[in-house]
Design a protein with these regions (language model features):
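A short, surface-exposed loop/turn module that caps and links secondary-structure elements
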Residues: 30-59
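Arg/Lys-rich, positively charged N-terminal/basic patches that mediate binding to nucleic acids
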Residues: 1-24
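Generic preference for hydrophobic/aromatic residues in regular secondary structure cores
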Residues: 1-7, 40-44, 82
Length: 84
C-alpha cells in the first residue's frame, strides 16, 4: 500500500539499535507500509509541522520522524520518507 524510503541517517540510527528494537521498528514499518489508517499510539502528526512521529517502545521510547512525500496526509500518502 505505501512505499517507505529510508535516508542514510535513518539507516545509521536503525543499525545502531539493539536487536529487540530492530525487530519492533521492522514490525512498525511494516504496519505503516500495509495499514491505511494508523493508530495514534504508533504514528502521530507533530503540531504545526508537516512531519509525523513513529513511536516504538522497548523499555525506552524510540522515535522516528516521517515525512509524507506525495500527499499532505499520511492516510492518503503512498510514499513516506523515514528521517532521523
Amino acid at each position: 500500500m505505501r512505499t517507505l524510503f529510508r535516508t542514510t541517517e535513518f539507516d545509521a540510527f536503525y543499525d545502531s539499535q539493539p536487536d529487540k528494537v530492530k525487530v519492533k521498528l521492522g514490525y512498525a514499518m511494516k504496519v505503516v507500509a500495509d495499514i491505511k489508517v494508523l493508530n495514534a499510539k504508533l504514528v502521530k502528526k507533530l503540531v504545526d509541522s508537516d512531519f509525523y512521529e513513529l513511536r516504538v517502545s522497548v523499555g525506552n521510547e524510540y522515535r522516528v520522524i516521517l515525512f509524507t512525500i506525495d500527499k499532505p496526509n499520511i492516510v492518503e500518502s503512498e510514499q513516506i520518507l523515514l528521517l532521523n
